[in-house]
């Protein structure tokens, strides 16, 4: 199958827009519809030559067509020897005034009048020259695409014409003898003798390393060119080209007789027969080529910028130093530095977004044409936790979803499709718990109408306010469902007033928002709500093109046993079929199965319908866009580009830091950290829990999620926790198996599993509070004034009178002199006359001895107090 090249790849290679390439192609007669269209390698080569040179390729003349046509091997064909002679004669005439004449004369040294086999040897040498030239051209075309645009000096057209004539003549000669057998031993021996004579006359040369390759001992098809190793560039200046052509062609190498090198390993087949030539010109790398335009990403280091400009790093750093910028090669360049460097080096710099390389959503965007059909509306039910969102959906679907939810709260996004009056409606049920704000955000991204459920007896709550904010930002129509109207304490006017304060004015108050009283428990108002949904959808005129390539949004993803990575998607445009190749962020695959909300396998899903997709290579992130591709190769390329971008971004951020970042990193190092390994059943829960855990922190403690993933708890997770200090293993809606439990017991690892998210967060909060340093408050118990001092064998005794409260033995004490604290310590001895007492009340005299302190003088005030530990909180 002929290899294809996309138009936007040609545009990127040449540094121009895809629109210009399409225009040039139309001038050449090549029909191209868009930047994603493909052309053959021959058309791409001709198009690139036309854009670079500005001249259309000339059509071959009748004489050239006759000369380049390969003769068919029939009994009436002319003798191959005569045909070869004609080719060589024509070649000599054409190149009589150029350095190529030397090559042809060398090829004529073998007598071809009487030996048909010698002709084959001669043409084989010519073929060898041709292969070297063609491999050089191919190597030039295979320069790695890295955003660097190289401008080469344009060569005279006369030399290019001579080179093309030379190659076509050699191809003609090769074709004329392609059906003949191998060269005889006599000719082989003669060539070997000539080589030895030449080596003897030219003196001792540097010994070649490795084993010589016998190219005559195998058929022509067994000798292949190693294009990956070939580095000779054909696009040289005039002087270099003449030197290259005038170089004497090397003669065929023969295998040396067995000797001291006989035990060396033989060279593998398929090695490059022109390796010597490659070594000779290996220094001709494109280091001195002029760079006039370069495309760079927004985040680029100094050494990366130098590589793009094909300049030494020292030159770039020297310019930066001259500007007073002390930067190293690993520092990132800002927009100002890039602008200055581009002016200094005379290079036009274009800042490109690396996301464009894998922006398949924009590349494959389908325009919804006038033939698009009506699609069902997508409704997202949102509101505060326990306000009855899932119960409302139960009443609509006549199912009991709430009974299956742990703790009676929704912890996943549910997607369902129902029919009302013959029209389909798709519902998304989002969680109302505070931890699931990202899930609610994804719900607004794919919805057409938002239903905000508010309990009539509870009013507006924090998550209700968040939903109102999301609805205003997304500019999606809103319908307010006032639930729990069957309760005696229901107050719909209170709900309307609170919502009006936040910008959602009811229609009966002169606003534009429908407020519908309902009761999910009794079913009151459900039909009226559905009628309003259909009426609003009719006004929106929702349409989609069912015949387009499928585009779907991932609302949930997980790793299921027996199915692997799965994703719940809602189709936004086109039709997704079983067998389609899809890409979704950094994951890709082929749709093996589609499962609807009733656990039934279906063959396809149309716009605004939902299903579970099976067949991806890894669990995609929730909120990603899934697109259908024409081939597995195309899907894989987009996914790998996205993976490389994510990896590069992560590595860049790990080293990109400012002074403020360094200060915060030092502060982070002083925090006490609780390491967590987290495993959940679905990606949405993983995202919500990980985000909530990262918010559980203060200036003293924090949580560090060192590993997280979707799926069951494995032995690797247990090993990771056992090898980490101060680490816990958490599982949400997953349970460890027998072998994992045994390993955890052996490693003394405690596995904590949960099914309700707020229980997990409460436990983690308690663990963090236990890691915090205790806080104490002081309670003053009394004061005494020193009236006299006495020396005792164990220390100084202060005779005191209690003037406030009471003194307590064993408590803490501080000595105050002239209003200044001079010592804090412990009261070790308290006596009333000669008796030891535990405490002395107000107005009584006593003897006091302070541990380790004898510098008490008359007039000091001794104050006793105790510290009470306070409960800490985040």
Swiss-Prot record:
Keywords: Cytoplasm, GTP-binding, Initiation factor, Nucleotide-binding, Protein biosynthesis. GO terms for molecular function: GTP binding; GTPase activity; translation initiation factor activity. The keyword Transit peptide does not apply. InterPro entries: EF-G-like_DII, IF2_II, IF2_N, P-loop_NTPase, Small_GTP-bd, T_Tr_GTP-bd_dom, TF_IF2_bacterial-like, TIF_IF2. GTP binds at residues 383-390, 429-433, 483-486. Residues 383-390 are annotated as: G1. Residues 374-543 form the tr-type G domain. This is Translation initiation factor IF-2. Pfam families: EF-G_D2, GTP_EFTU, IF-2, IF2_N. Belongs to the TRAFAC class translation factor GTPase superfamily. Classic translation factor GTPase family. IF-2 subfamily. The keyword Cytoplasm applies. Residues 429-432 are annotated as: G3. GO terms for cellular component: cytosol. Residues 55-139, 245-281 are annotated as: Disordered. One of the essential components for the initiation of protein synthesis. Protects formylmethionyl-tRNA from spontaneous hydrolysis and promotes its binding to the 30S ribosomal subunits. Also involved in the hydrolysis of GTP during the formation of the 70S ribosomal complex. Residues 56-71, 82-93 have a biased composition (Polar residues). Residues 103-139 have a biased composition (Basic and acidic residues). It comes from the Bacteria. It is found in: Cytoplasm. HAMAP family: IF_2_B. Residues 408-412 are annotated as: G2. It comes from Sulfurimonas denitrificans (strain ATCC 33889 / DSM 1251). Gene3D superfamilies: 1.10.10.2480, P-loop containing nucleotide triphosphate hydrolases (3.40.50.300), Translation factors (2.40.30.10), Translation initiation factor IF- 2, domain 3 (3.40.50.10050). Residues 519-521 are annotated as: G5. Residues 483-486 are annotated as: G4.
């Amino acid at each position: 199958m002929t290899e294809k090249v996309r138009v936007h790849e040609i545009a990127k290679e040449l540094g121009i827009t895809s629109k210009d390439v399409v225009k040039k192609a139309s001038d050449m007669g090549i029909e191209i519809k868009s930047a994603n269209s493909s052309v053959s390698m021959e058309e791409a080569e001709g198009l690139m030559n036309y854009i670079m040179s500005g001249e259309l390729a000339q059509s071959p003349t009748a004489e050239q067509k006759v000369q380049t046509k390969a003769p068919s091997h029939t009994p009436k064909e002319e003798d191959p020897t005569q045909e070869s002679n004609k080719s060589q004669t024509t070649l000599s005439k054409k190149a009589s005034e150029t350095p190529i004449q030397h090559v042809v004369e060398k090829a004529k040294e073998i007598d071809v009048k009487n030996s048909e086999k010698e002709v084959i040897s001669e043409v084989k040498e010519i073929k060898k020259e041709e292969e070297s030239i063609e491999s050089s051209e191919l190597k030039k075309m295979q320069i790695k695409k890295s955003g660097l645009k190289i401008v080469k000096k344009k060569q005279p057209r006369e030399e290019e014409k001579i080179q093309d004539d030379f190659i076509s003549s050699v191809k003609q000669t090769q074709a004329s003898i392609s059906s003949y057998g191998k060269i005889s031993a006599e000719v082989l021996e003669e060539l070997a003798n000539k080589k030895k004579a030449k080596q003897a006359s030219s003196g001792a040369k540097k010994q070649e390393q490795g084993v010589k390759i016998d190219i005559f001992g195998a058929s022509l098809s067994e000798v292949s060119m190693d294009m990956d190793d070939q580095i000779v560039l054909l696009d040289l200046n005039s002087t270099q080209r003449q030197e290259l052509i005038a170089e004497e062609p090397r003669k065929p190498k023969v295998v040396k007789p067995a000797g001291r090198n006989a035990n060396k390993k033989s060279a593998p087949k398929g090695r490059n027969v022109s390796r010597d030539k490659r070594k000779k010109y290996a220094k001709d790398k494109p280091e001195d080529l002029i760079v006039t335009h370069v495309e760079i990403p927004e985040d680029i280091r100094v050494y990366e910028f130098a590589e793009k400009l094909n300049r030494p790093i020292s030159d770039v750093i020297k310019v930066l130093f001259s500007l007073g910028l002390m930067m190293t090669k690993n520092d990132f360049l800002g927009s100002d530095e890039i602008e200055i460097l581009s002016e200094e080096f005379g290079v036009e710099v274009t800042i490109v977004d690396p996301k464009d390389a894998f922006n398949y959503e924009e590349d494959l965007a389908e325009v919804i044409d006038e033939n698009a059909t009506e699609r069902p509306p997508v409704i997202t039910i949102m509101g505060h936790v326990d306000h009855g969102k899932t119960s409302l959906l139960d009443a609509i679907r006549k199912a009991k979803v709430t009974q299956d939810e742990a703790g009676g709260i929704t912890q996943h996004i549910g997607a369902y499709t129902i029919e009302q009056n013959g029209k389909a409606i798709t519902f998304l049920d989002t969680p109302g718990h505070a931890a699931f704000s990202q899930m609610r955000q994804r719900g607004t991204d794919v919805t057409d109408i938002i239903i905000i459920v508010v309990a009539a007896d509870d009013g507006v709550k924090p998550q209700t306010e968040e939903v109102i904010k999301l609805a205003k930002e997304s500019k999606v129509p809103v319908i307010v469902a006032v639930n729990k109207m069957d309760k005696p304490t229901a107050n719909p006017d209170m709900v309307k007033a609170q919502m009006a304060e936040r910008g959602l004015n009811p229609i009966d108050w002169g606003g534009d928002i429908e407020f519908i009283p309902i009761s999910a428990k009794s079913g009151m108002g459900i039909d009226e709500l559905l009628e309003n949904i259909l009426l609003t959808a009719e006004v929106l005129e929702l349409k989609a093109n069912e015949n387009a390539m499928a585009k779907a949004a991932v609302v949930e993803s997980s790793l299921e046993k027996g199915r692997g990575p799965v994703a719940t998607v809602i189709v936004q445009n086109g039709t997704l079929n079983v067998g389609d190749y899809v890409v979704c962020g950094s994951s890709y695959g082929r749709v093996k199965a589609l499962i609807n909300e009733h656990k039934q396998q279906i063959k396809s899903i149309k716009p605004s319908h939902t299903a579970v997709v099976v067949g991806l290579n890894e669990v995609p992130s929730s909120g990603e866009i899934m697109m259908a591709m024409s081939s597995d190769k195309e899907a894989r390329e987009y996914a790998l580009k996205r993976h490389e971008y994510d990896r590069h971004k992560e590595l860049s951020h790990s080293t990109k830091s400012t002074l403020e970042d360094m200060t915060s990193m030092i502060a982070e190092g002083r925090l006490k950290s609780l390491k967590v390994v987290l495993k959940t059943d679905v990606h949405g829960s993983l995202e919500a829990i990980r985000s909530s855990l990262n918010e559980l922190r203060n200036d003293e403690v924090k949580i560090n999620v060192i590993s997280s993933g979707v799926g069951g708890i494995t032995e690797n997770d247990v090993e990771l926790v056992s090898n980490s200090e101060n680490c816990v293993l958490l599982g949400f809606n997953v349970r460890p198996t027998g072998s994992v439990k045994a390993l955890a017991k052996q490693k003394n690892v405690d596995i904590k599993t949960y099914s309700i998210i707020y229980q997990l967060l409460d436990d983690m909060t308690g663990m963090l509070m236990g890691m915090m340093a205790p806080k104490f408050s002081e309670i003053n118990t009394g004061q005494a004034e020193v009236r006299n001092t006495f020396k005792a064998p164990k220390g100084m005794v202060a005779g005191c009178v209690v003037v406030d409260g009471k003194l307590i033995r064993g408590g803490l004490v501080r000595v105050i002199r002239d209003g200044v604290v001079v010592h804090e310590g412990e009261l070790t001895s308290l006596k009333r006359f000669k008796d030891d007492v535990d405490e002395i009340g107000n107005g009584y005299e006593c003897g006091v001895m302070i541990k380790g302190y004898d510098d008490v003088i008359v007039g000091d005030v001794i104050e006793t107090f105790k510290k009470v530990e306070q409960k800490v909180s985040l």
